[in-house]
Each structure stands twice: as C-alpha cells, then as structure tokens.
C-alpha cells in the first residue's frame, strides 16, 4: 500500500486511485470506505489479526487481511462475500487469507470479547503517543470520547456564501439542517455539488470560522491572511468585509495557491491579492507588503483537532513534532507581527488541541514578541463541542 511508505497523504493517494480506475458509483463508495477504514482502524485490525495468526505476514498478505477483517468488523457486507472477494485479490496469499478470515467468522464472539477488554488505543485504533498525552490532559473518559469521535464519519457541513446567496434562500432551494454552533452553517445529507460549483457555499467545519470572527475585519480594512490556502478562511473574511478593503492572501506552496485562486474566483471574492510567501525562510518585509489593520495567522500544526477528517494524521505524528512545531509557529508570529499597524489585531489559530501549540505558544509570544498584547483565546474540543478541535488567540499591537 502506497500510504504505508509514508511519502504521500491518504487523500492524495485515494484521489489518484479513483482517477486511474473506472469505478461504478457503488464500487467507488465501497473502495473509499475500505481504503479509509483500513487506515483509520489499522491498530484494531492488527490486534485481531494477531489473535488469529501468530506468524508475521508480508506486506501484501497483511494488507489483504486488513481489508478482509475490516469488512467483517465494520461493514454490512455478507460474511461469505467479504471473505471470497478478499481471497480473490490476495494472489499467492490466497490460502493464508482464506484460512484467517474463515477463522475470524468462526471465532468472532471470542474476538469481540478480547477487543472489548483491550486498552483504549487498541479498541479505538489510536497510537499510544496520542492516547497517553490526551489522558494526561483530559482524563480517560474524555479521551475515549475523543477517540470515538475521531472514528466517526465526518458530517457534511457547508458555510453559506452570503456574497451570493442567503441562508434562507439555500434552505428553500434544497433543504439543509441549521447547525446550532453557527448561523451560516448547514448540515447536508450529501454534497451539494451544484451549489459548490457555482460558489453558493463552501464545505468547512464551523470551528474554522472562530478565528475569523475573533479577528473581526471591517469593510475597508487592510488584512493579511498569512497562511491562506485553500481559502476557506480567506473567503469568509472577504464575506465579512463585503468584498470591500483589501486582503493579501499568502501561502508557501504554488500548488495550494492555485487551489486558493480557484476557490476565491468560484466564491465571487474580488478583494483578495494572492501572493507566494515563505514566512519562515524568506519573510516578506514592510517595504514589500506594507502594514495591515488585521492579520490572520492560521499556522501549520499537528492537526490533532481534525483527525476525523484527516484519517492518516494519527499514524504520522511523533513526539518530536510537538517540540518542532511550536518553534515554527512562534517564528511565524514574530515574522508577521512587524507588519501589524499600532492598534491593529492579530489572531493566531491552529486546528490542534495540544497545549504546546496553543496556550504555550501564547505564553511564549508574551516573552518573544513583547510588542503584542494578548487579549483573549478560545478553543473547541470535539468531545465537548461536537465540532472539530481548534484554537484561536487574539493579540493587539500597542
């Protein structure tokens, strides 16, 4: 499996696989379910396979076993069909895969009892590094709830683009259920493709709007969105500014800037200037960009608040990431702070729930960027707020 090599993200691999293979609608949905499911439940699957077969399997055999056990554990596919279809894809490992999966069917009750008695990380398929740090931070009950949340399919949530349409108009046109967390959000049964294509809405979690509302840009302001791609927050800032004033939207990746431009054009955003910028290695200066009334710094982070949507994140994180990332985040704050006008506002935000990237960075900013005055912060926690995990802190410049 290409994902296991660690060089590509799961979403990119899936997208390419779907382009390379002509699936029917049903087969496409099943392929996606198994692909994401095997990654999401990898630790649980390996635990069950270990109960059925002590001998270590090669990569191809292990993947076939994971796909088969996942179907037996998490889908409604008939037992015989799940076994037979998996065996047919196993090549030279057919005999081993057939034997292990048939044993699973025979011993399922005992296997489920063993799984129920297993530690949280095994039962809910999370690495020990995350389970341990969350247990220290939240306690075992909330950690269990967080792991359960991360394993649930993400709801389809859209933010209504008021530059083009009102919430009421969209609800009359095709339904959607209001979301209590935010008045511009609707929960959909399925992706509203025509609305997305015509820019009437943008798919995003309501927690992503928190930082923008804390920044509170006004029509006519000059705003810097320092790490802007793919544009969900940028477009919401423009919406709040009624397309008046100016937003300079930056990103380090040319590919991501392309997506940013496409999204802004589709959403009818006209007050944004898109620029490539590396805020760590070669930060643009005041001569190049000028000064800003408002700065949004949505910093690269561990993504531990969005594991439900980014299924491979849990397996990629290492302890050193929680040492490395805060240094980079603090570097970003210091490099953009000089572009803020006196009396201006800067919001630092992440989609992490880790204190090293959030409150501790805020405390560091008081020491390392004394020109910034901390005003307030807010965070969302999935197990408490029923939205993605996020953090935002507001600073002003004296």
Annotate the PLM regions.
Residues 1-398:
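S-adenosylmethionine
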């Amino acid at each position: 499996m290409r994902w296991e090599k660690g060089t590509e993200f799961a979403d990119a691999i899936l997208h390419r696989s779907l382009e390379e293979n002509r699936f029917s609608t049903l087969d496409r949905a099943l392929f996606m379910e198994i692909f994401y499911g095997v990654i999401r439940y990898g630790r649980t699957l390996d635990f069950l396979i270990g109960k059925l077969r002590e001998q270590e399997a090669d990569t191809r055999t292990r993947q076939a076993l994971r796909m088969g056990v996942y179907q037996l554990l998490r889908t409604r596919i008939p037992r015989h069909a799940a076994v037979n279809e998996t065996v047919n894809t196993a090549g030279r490992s057919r005999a081993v895969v057939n034997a292990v999966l048939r044993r699973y069917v025979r011993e399922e009750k005992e296997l489920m009892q063993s799984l129920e008695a297993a530690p949280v990380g095994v039962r809910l398929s999370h690495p020990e590094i995350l389970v341990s740090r969350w247990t220290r931070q939240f306690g075992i009950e909330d950690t269990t709830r967080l792991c359960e949340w991360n394993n649930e399919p993400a709801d389809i949530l859209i933010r209504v683009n008021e530059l083009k349409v009102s919430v009421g108009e969209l609800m009359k046109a095709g339904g959607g259920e209001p979301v209590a967390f935010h008045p511009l959000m609707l929960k959909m049964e399925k992706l509203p493709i025509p609305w997305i294509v015509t820019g009437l809405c943008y798919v995003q979690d309501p927690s992503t709007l928190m930082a923008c509302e804390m920044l509170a840009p006004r029509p006519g302001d000059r705003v810097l969105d320092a790490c802007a791609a793919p544009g969900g927050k940028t477009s919401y800032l423009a919406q709040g500014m009624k397309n008046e004033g100016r937003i300079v939207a930056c990103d380090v990746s040319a590919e991501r800037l392309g997506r940013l431009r496409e999204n802004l054009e589709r959403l009818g955003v006209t007050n944004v200037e898109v620029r490539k910028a590396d805020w760590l290695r070669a930060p643009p200066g005041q001569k190049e960009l000028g000064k800003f009334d408002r700065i949004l710094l949505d910093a690269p982070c561990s993504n531990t608040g969005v594991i439900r949507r980014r299924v491979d994140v849990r397996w990629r994180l290492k302890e050193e990431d929680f040492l490395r990332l805060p240094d980079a985040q603090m570097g970003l704050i210091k490099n953009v702070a000089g572009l803020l006008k006196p009396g201006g506002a800067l919001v630092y935000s992440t989609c992490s729930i880790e204190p090293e990237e959030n409150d501790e960075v805020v405390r560091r900013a008081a020491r390392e960027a004394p020109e910034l005055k901390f005003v307030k912060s807010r965070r969302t926690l999935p197990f408490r707020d029923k939205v993605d995990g996020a953090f935002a802190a507001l600073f002003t410049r004296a």
